[in-house]
Curated annotation (Swiss-Prot):
Keywords: Metal-binding, Ribonucleoprotein, Ribosomal protein, RNA-binding, rRNA-binding, Zinc. Belongs to the bacterial ribosomal protein bL31 family. Type A subfamily. HAMAP family: Ribosomal_bL31_1. This is Large ribosomal subunit protein bL31. NCBIfam families: L31 (TIGR00105), PRK00019.1 (NF000612), PRK00528.1 (NF001809). Its cofactor is Zn(2+). Part of the 50S ribosomal subunit. Binds the 23S rRNA. GO terms for biological process: translation. GO terms for cellular component: ribonucleoprotein complex; ribosome. Binds 1 zinc ion per subunit.
Amino acid sequence: MKEGIHPMYSDATVKCLCGNTFQTRSTRKEINTEICSACHPFFTGKQKLIDTAGRVERFKRRYGQV
């Protein structure tokens, strides 16, 4: 690698809106995020299946059980 052309890669603090913080490495000193593995529904197991406006039922009525 050439000297002086690459950004400094140092320790960084990641802060989530839920209050969770953790350390990683980045070219930035602080990273703010809206969602992390501590509050994301996929990782917490609080995932909900949302059927918006009965689209599944409407599909089944229209095309039947294939």
